[in-house]
Amino acid sequence: MTKKSIPKSAKKVFEGILFDVYHWEQEMFDGTKRTFEAVKRIPTTQIIATTKEKKIIMLKEQQPHIGNFTSVPGGQVERTETPLHTTKKELLEECGMKAETLKLWKITNSGGKIDWESHYYFAQNCKQIKTPENNTAGEQIKMYELTFDEFILETQKPEFRNKMFQLEIYKMIKENTLKDFKNLIFN
């Protein structure tokens, strides 16, 4: 996990819908002080959802302000929710599915001037239990299933939205650890 960029002494100077702005005094190397600023984004969840048939769920999405993109299921953690609650909710809303097992894989933080935690979950042996709520005023979603190898290729395309996850996959490709990742997903 990347070190958080906002110290505990920081003061919240603005609270937005997605972002809060923080300021704090920082002593410089010459002893002078300066005001620093960073933003904290509400956390998100990303779900690597699998079926009993060893397929991975992907989404083709369209949103009015973004256009078309691909992604794994997931969403924003509302201020009153936990990441686990959001994971279950998003899997049900976007895919109409419930997981037999949910496991937290990792939490990443973008670091720098934007403090943004992303919680990655493995949702194993997902089962369809209802019709997805995937065509709303704010997003149009089409769900599809891929093999592990197809999934890896899909995450490396420019239209894959989650760039932090894309980097994680690229790192596994470079370090030749995709087999370990596959075992984590399905076992």
Where on the chain are the PLM-derived regions?
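Active-site-adjacent beta-strand/loop module that shapes the phosphate/pyrophosphate-binding cleft
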Residues: 22-30, 111-130, 144
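Short, solvent-exposed loop/turn elements at beta->coil junctions and helix N-caps
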Residues: 11-12, 105-111
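Extended interaction-bearing regions that mediate binding to partners or small molecules
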Residues: 1-11
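Nudix hydrolase/Nudix homology domain
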Residues: 2, 68, 79, 113, ...
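Short loop segments at secondary-structure junctions
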Residues: 27-30, 51-55, 62, 124-128, ...
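The catalytic Nudix box helix
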Residues: 71-106, 121, 135-138, 147
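Acidic, metal-coordinating catalytic segment for phosphate/diphosphate chemistry
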Residues: 9-48, 52-53
